[in-house]
């Protein structure tokens, strides 16, 4: 939530915790999570993919970014990795979030299987392919 941004009205909710900042604890939080709701920055989406966590991506809107998060979210959605909820849609109708969570839950195995099958998860193969293409270009 950021430093000094904790919402005191949410402090007593079961199964919900606010952190001003997460550093070394992130691995434990991912491990404990059944699903992830996140922005769609490059680092976090690839963490989600590596961990095969069912997820809802809420990309920053174009007016608040370069549009890269929208492209990231669209890419992950088209590959079957993520449910995407545009921030504008969430702000206009917050009741859409439970619907997205239900969709995620109902299709959890489908999202996990898509992430397991992703070629993007095999860094070794991807690096070898780049090296081979460079070698082939020099031959």
Enumerate the language-model features and the residues they cover.
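Donor-nucleotide binding loops and adjacent catalytic segments primarily
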Residues: 1-36, 70-72, 85-94
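Acidic donor-binding loop of glycosyltransferase active sites
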Residues: 31-46, 53
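Short hydrophobic beta-strand element within catalytic cores of glycosyltransferases
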Residues: 38, 54-66
């Amino acid at each position: 939530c950021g430093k000094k941004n904790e919402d005191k009205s949410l402090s007593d909710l079961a199964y919900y915790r606010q952190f001003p900042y997460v550093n070394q604890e992130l691995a434990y939080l991912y491990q404990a999570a059944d699903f992830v709701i996140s922005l769609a920055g490059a680092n976090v989406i690839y963490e989600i993919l590596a961990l095969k966590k069912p997820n809802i991506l809420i990309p920053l809107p174009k007016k608040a970014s370069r549009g890269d998060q929208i492209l990231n979210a669209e890419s992950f959605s088209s590959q079957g990795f993520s449910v995407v909820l545009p921030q504008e849609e969430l702000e206009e109708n917050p009741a859409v979030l439970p619907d997205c969570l239900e969709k995620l839950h109902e299709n959890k195995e489908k999202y996990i299987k898509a992430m397991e099958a992703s070629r993007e998860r095999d860094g070794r193969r991807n690096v070898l392919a780049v090296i081979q293409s460079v070698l082939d270009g020099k031959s």
